[in-house]
């Protein structure tokens, strides 16, 4: 193979693996947004959110909760992906994900991070608890609604656009 053929082959292989990666991410988005997954995750968090406290110290109870979450949620996602992509390998995808993490939507990457990063997992529970207790972020005070249309209550002379 000459250099041009090798480059062409590399590009072909790269674009195929990129397309496969993009397909998996698309399926992940579908799975995560699905009502069944949302219910599964919400029920799990409802069961344990009161255990989590916003302190530097981590309770011993966090470890079995983390392990249960991984086996429940990761298993569910992997089963769903296997239904869509026969032969799917979660370990291989996780490795590929590290190389493409800047290309994945933040919410999906953050959710996947909860499988491997305990602090991300704990933060997810702390955010959920704050929301349940009414301490979530309230961005409504920063929102201002402005009409893009001129009001018809203005005198006709002010309501007409002049060039």
From Swiss-Prot:
One Gene Ontology term of the molecular function aspect: transcription coactivator activity
A Pfam family hit: ARL2_Bind_BART
Gene Ontology terms: cellular component: centrosome; ciliary basal body; cytosol; midbody; mitochondrial intermembrane space; nucleoplasm; spindle
Glycoprotein found in the keyword field: no
GO terms, biological process: maintenance of protein location in nucleus; positive regulation of tyrosine phosphorylation of STAT protein
Annotated signal peptide: none
Key words of the record: Cell projection, Cilium, Cytoplasm, Cytoskeleton, Mitochondrion, Nucleus
Disulfide bonds: none
Compartment(s) of residence: Cytoplasm; Mitochondrion intermembrane space; Cytoplasm, Cytoskeleton, Microtubule organizing center, Centrosome; Nucleus
Protein task: Together with ARL2, plays a role in the nuclear translocation, retention and transcriptional activity of STAT3. May play a role as an effector of ARL2.
Subunit structure: Interacts with GTP bound ARL2 and ARL3; the complex ARL2-ARL2BP as well as ARL2BP alone, binds to SLC25A4/ANT1. Interaction with ARL2 may be required for cilia basal body localization. Interacts with STAT3; interaction is enhanced with ARL2. Found in a complex with ARL2BP, ARL2 and SLC25A6. Found in a complex with ARL2, ARL2BP and SLC25A4. Interacts with STAT2, STAT3 and STAT4.
Assigned protein family: Belongs to the ARL2BP family.
Name used for this protein in its record: ADP-ribosylation factor-like protein 2-binding protein
Organism encoding this protein: Pongo abelii
Protein's gene: ARL2BP
